[in-house]
Amino acid sequence: MSSQTPVVTVDGPSGAGKGTLCMLLSKKLGFQLLDSGAIYRVLALAAIHHGVDTESEDALVPLATHLDVQFVAEGDLVKVILEGEDVSKELRKEETGMAASKVAALPRVREALLRRQRAFEAAPGLVADGRDMGTVVFPNAKAKIFLDASAEERAHRRLKQLQDKGLDVRFDDLLSEIQERDDRDRNRPVAPLRPAEDALVLDSTSMSIDEVVEKALQYIESKLAE
Protein backbone atom coordinates (compact mmCIF):
# COMPACT_ATOMS: atom_id res chain seq x y z
CA MET A 1 0.00 0.00 0.00
CA SER A 2 1.30 3.42 -0.90
CA SER A 3 1.72 5.87 1.95
CA GLN A 4 1.30 8.71 -0.58
CA THR A 5 -2.35 8.02 -1.38
CA PRO A 6 -4.82 9.23 1.27
CA VAL A 7 -7.24 6.50 2.30
CA VAL A 8 -10.42 7.06 4.32
CA THR A 9 -12.01 3.93 5.80
CA VAL A 10 -15.62 3.68 6.95
CA ASP A 11 -16.51 0.52 8.85
CA GLY A 12 -19.64 -0.52 10.72
CA PRO A 13 -22.55 -2.96 10.83
CA SER A 14 -25.12 -3.51 8.09
CA GLY A 15 -27.68 -0.71 7.81
CA ALA A 16 -25.70 1.95 9.67
CA GLY A 17 -25.58 4.18 6.57
CA LYS A 18 -22.03 3.47 5.39
CA GLY A 19 -22.94 3.32 1.71
CA THR A 20 -24.64 6.71 1.66
CA LEU A 21 -21.89 8.32 3.73
CA CYS A 22 -19.11 6.89 1.54
CA MET A 23 -20.82 7.97 -1.68
CA LEU A 24 -21.20 11.54 -0.38
CA LEU A 25 -17.64 11.64 0.98
CA SER A 26 -16.16 10.37 -2.28
CA LYS A 27 -18.04 13.06 -4.21
CA LYS A 28 -17.07 15.87 -1.82
CA LEU A 29 -13.42 14.77 -1.62
CA GLY A 30 -13.13 13.70 -5.26
CA PHE A 31 -11.80 10.29 -4.16
CA GLN A 32 -12.18 6.80 -5.65
CA LEU A 33 -14.79 4.57 -3.99
CA LEU A 34 -14.58 0.96 -2.84
CA ASP A 35 -17.65 -0.89 -1.57
CA SER A 36 -15.99 -3.93 -0.05
CA GLY A 37 -19.32 -5.33 1.07
CA ALA A 38 -20.36 -5.38 -2.57
CA ILE A 39 -17.26 -7.43 -3.42
CA TYR A 40 -18.37 -10.13 -1.01
CA ARG A 41 -21.90 -9.92 -2.40
CA VAL A 42 -20.51 -10.16 -5.94
CA LEU A 43 -18.53 -13.26 -5.00
CA ALA A 44 -21.59 -14.77 -3.31
CA LEU A 45 -23.68 -13.98 -6.39
CA ALA A 46 -21.02 -15.42 -8.71
CA ALA A 47 -21.06 -18.57 -6.57
CA ILE A 48 -24.84 -18.80 -6.85
CA HIS A 49 -24.68 -18.22 -10.63
CA HIS A 50 -22.00 -20.89 -11.07
CA GLY A 51 -23.52 -23.39 -8.62
CA VAL A 52 -20.65 -23.08 -6.13
CA ASP A 53 -21.26 -23.88 -2.43
CA THR A 54 -21.08 -20.58 -0.48
CA GLU A 55 -19.57 -22.41 2.50
CA SER A 56 -16.83 -24.28 0.58
CA GLU A 57 -13.44 -22.55 0.78
CA ASP A 58 -11.89 -24.92 -1.77
CA ALA A 59 -14.51 -23.99 -4.35
CA LEU A 60 -14.69 -20.27 -3.53
CA VAL A 61 -10.97 -19.39 -3.52
CA PRO A 62 -10.45 -19.94 -7.29
CA LEU A 63 -13.66 -18.03 -8.01
CA ALA A 64 -12.48 -15.13 -5.82
CA THR A 65 -9.03 -15.10 -7.41
CA HIS A 66 -10.45 -14.66 -10.91
CA LEU A 67 -13.49 -12.55 -9.97
CA ASP A 68 -14.33 -10.18 -12.83
CA VAL A 69 -15.84 -7.15 -11.06
CA GLN A 70 -15.94 -3.42 -11.77
CA PHE A 71 -17.43 -0.44 -9.94
CA VAL A 72 -18.82 2.21 -12.30
CA ALA A 73 -20.00 5.51 -10.79
CA GLU A 74 -23.06 7.00 -12.45
CA GLY A 75 -24.74 10.02 -10.89
CA ASP A 76 -25.54 9.26 -7.25
CA LEU A 77 -25.16 5.52 -7.73
CA VAL A 78 -22.36 3.02 -8.14
CA LYS A 79 -23.14 0.31 -10.69
CA VAL A 80 -21.58 -3.05 -9.94
CA ILE A 81 -20.58 -5.02 -13.03
CA LEU A 82 -20.04 -8.79 -12.72
CA GLU A 83 -18.67 -10.54 -15.81
CA GLY A 84 -19.99 -7.71 -17.97
CA GLU A 85 -23.48 -7.69 -16.43
CA ASP A 86 -24.98 -4.98 -14.20
CA VAL A 87 -25.92 -6.88 -11.03
CA SER A 88 -26.51 -3.86 -8.77
CA LYS A 89 -30.15 -4.72 -8.01
CA GLU A 90 -29.55 -8.43 -7.57
CA LEU A 91 -26.79 -7.71 -5.04
CA ARG A 92 -29.27 -6.04 -2.67
CA LYS A 93 -31.47 -9.10 -2.24
CA GLU A 94 -31.60 -10.47 1.31
CA GLU A 95 -30.57 -13.92 0.04
CA THR A 96 -27.38 -12.48 -1.46
CA GLY A 97 -26.60 -10.54 1.71
CA MET A 98 -26.90 -13.57 3.95
CA ALA A 99 -24.74 -15.63 1.57
CA ALA A 100 -22.14 -12.84 1.51
CA SER A 101 -21.90 -12.84 5.30
CA LYS A 102 -21.18 -16.60 5.20
CA VAL A 103 -18.55 -16.10 2.47
CA ALA A 104 -16.89 -13.29 4.45
CA ALA A 105 -16.38 -15.59 7.44
CA LEU A 106 -14.04 -17.92 5.50
CA PRO A 107 -10.34 -17.06 6.11
CA ARG A 108 -8.87 -18.23 2.78
CA VAL A 109 -11.60 -16.48 0.81
CA ARG A 110 -10.92 -13.21 2.64
CA GLU A 111 -7.21 -13.62 1.87
CA ALA A 112 -7.96 -14.17 -1.83
CA LEU A 113 -10.02 -10.97 -1.99
CA LEU A 114 -7.65 -8.86 0.12
CA ARG A 115 -5.24 -8.07 -2.72
CA ARG A 116 -8.14 -7.22 -5.02
CA GLN A 117 -9.49 -4.71 -2.51
CA ARG A 118 -6.11 -3.07 -1.94
CA ALA A 119 -5.75 -2.56 -5.70
CA PHE A 120 -8.51 0.05 -5.50
CA GLU A 121 -6.11 2.43 -3.72
CA ALA A 122 -5.21 5.05 -6.32
CA ALA A 123 -4.76 8.81 -6.71
CA PRO A 124 -6.18 11.20 -5.75
CA GLY A 125 -7.45 9.10 -2.83
CA LEU A 126 -9.84 6.35 -1.75
CA VAL A 127 -12.94 6.09 0.41
CA ALA A 128 -13.28 2.44 1.47
CA ASP A 129 -16.63 1.17 2.76
CA GLY A 130 -16.68 -2.08 4.71
CA ARG A 131 -16.44 -3.89 8.01
CA ASP A 132 -12.68 -4.40 8.40
CA MET A 133 -11.25 -1.65 6.17
CA GLY A 134 -9.53 0.20 9.01
CA THR A 135 -8.46 -2.87 10.97
CA VAL A 136 -7.29 -5.28 8.24
CA VAL A 137 -7.39 -4.02 4.66
CA PHE A 138 -6.03 -0.48 5.13
CA PRO A 139 -4.52 -0.43 8.66
CA ASN A 140 -2.37 2.60 7.74
CA ALA A 141 -5.29 4.69 6.44
CA LYS A 142 -5.05 8.42 7.17
CA ALA A 143 -8.61 8.64 8.52
CA LYS A 144 -10.75 5.87 10.00
CA ILE A 145 -14.45 6.07 10.85
CA PHE A 146 -16.67 3.47 12.54
CA LEU A 147 -20.33 4.24 11.78
CA ASP A 148 -22.81 2.58 14.10
CA ALA A 149 -26.56 2.66 14.88
CA SER A 150 -28.84 0.59 17.10
CA ALA A 151 -30.18 -2.66 15.65
CA GLU A 152 -33.71 -1.32 16.07
CA GLU A 153 -32.95 1.85 14.11
CA ARG A 154 -31.25 -0.15 11.36
CA ALA A 155 -34.26 -2.47 11.15
CA HIS A 156 -36.61 0.53 10.87
CA ARG A 157 -34.48 1.97 8.04
CA ARG A 158 -34.48 -1.35 6.19
CA LEU A 159 -38.23 -1.72 6.71
CA LYS A 160 -38.86 1.67 5.13
CA GLN A 161 -36.58 0.86 2.18
CA LEU A 162 -38.40 -2.38 1.47
CA GLN A 163 -41.88 -0.92 1.99
CA ASP A 164 -41.02 1.92 -0.39
CA LYS A 165 -40.36 -0.80 -2.97
CA GLY A 166 -43.81 -2.26 -2.34
CA LEU A 167 -42.55 -5.30 -0.43
CA ASP A 168 -44.52 -6.81 2.46
CA VAL A 169 -42.07 -7.39 5.32
CA ARG A 170 -42.27 -7.64 9.11
CA PHE A 171 -40.17 -5.49 11.44
CA ASP A 172 -39.52 -8.39 13.83
CA ASP A 173 -38.17 -10.56 11.00
CA LEU A 174 -35.80 -7.81 9.84
CA LEU A 175 -34.62 -7.13 13.40
CA SER A 176 -33.88 -10.83 13.94
CA GLU A 177 -31.90 -11.02 10.68
CA ILE A 178 -29.87 -7.94 11.63
CA GLN A 179 -29.16 -9.25 15.13
CA GLU A 180 -28.10 -12.64 13.73
CA ARG A 181 -25.80 -11.00 11.19
CA ASP A 182 -24.33 -8.72 13.87
CA ASP A 183 -23.61 -11.70 16.11
CA ARG A 184 -21.96 -13.63 13.27
CA ASP A 185 -19.87 -10.64 12.12
CA ARG A 186 -18.76 -9.57 15.62
CA ASN A 187 -17.78 -13.08 16.72
CA ARG A 188 -16.18 -14.59 13.62
CA PRO A 189 -12.59 -15.79 14.24
CA VAL A 190 -11.07 -13.78 11.37
CA ALA A 191 -11.43 -9.97 11.12
CA PRO A 192 -14.39 -9.62 13.51
CA LEU A 193 -16.44 -6.42 13.24
CA ARG A 194 -14.95 -3.86 15.64
CA PRO A 195 -13.70 -0.26 15.51
CA ALA A 196 -10.01 0.31 14.83
CA GLU A 197 -8.26 1.67 17.92
CA ASP A 198 -7.62 4.98 16.15
CA ALA A 199 -11.07 5.30 14.56
CA LEU A 200 -13.66 8.02 15.10
CA VAL A 201 -16.84 6.27 16.27
CA LEU A 202 -20.07 7.90 15.05
CA ASP A 203 -23.48 6.69 16.27
CA SER A 204 -25.99 7.67 13.59
CA THR A 205 -29.07 6.42 15.49
CA SER A 206 -30.36 9.95 16.16
CA MET A 207 -28.38 11.83 13.51
CA SER A 208 -29.38 13.03 10.04
CA ILE A 209 -27.14 12.11 7.11
CA ASP A 210 -26.12 15.78 6.82
CA GLU A 211 -24.96 15.77 10.44
CA VAL A 212 -23.01 12.55 9.91
CA VAL A 213 -21.33 13.90 6.76
CA GLU A 214 -20.41 17.18 8.49
CA LYS A 215 -18.78 15.44 11.46
CA ALA A 216 -16.99 12.97 9.18
CA LEU A 217 -15.63 15.71 6.90
CA GLN A 218 -14.36 17.76 9.85
CA TYR A 219 -12.52 14.71 11.15
CA ILE A 220 -11.14 13.69 7.74
CA GLU A 221 -9.89 17.19 6.91
CA SER A 222 -8.10 17.40 10.25
CA LYS A 223 -6.44 14.00 9.71
CA LEU A 224 -5.38 14.78 6.12
CA ALA A 225 -3.82 18.03 7.33
CA GLU A 226 -1.54 16.22 9.80
Curated annotation (Swiss-Prot):
Binding site for ATP: G12, P13, S14, G15, A16, G17, K18, G19, T20
GO biological process entries: nucleobase-containing small molecule interconversion; pyrimidine nucleotide metabolic process
Keyword 4Fe-4S: no
EC number assigned by the record: 2.7.4.25
Reactions catalysed, as given in the entry: CMP + ATP = CDP + ADP; dCMP + ATP = dCDP + ADP
Keywords: ATP-binding, Cytoplasm, Kinase, Nucleotide-binding, Transferase
PANTHER family: CYTIDYLATE KINASE, CYTIDYLATE KINASE/PANTOATE-BETA-ALANINE LIGASE
Protein name: Cytidylate kinase
Gene source species: Vibrio vulnificus (strain CMCP6)
Gene designation per UniProt: cmk
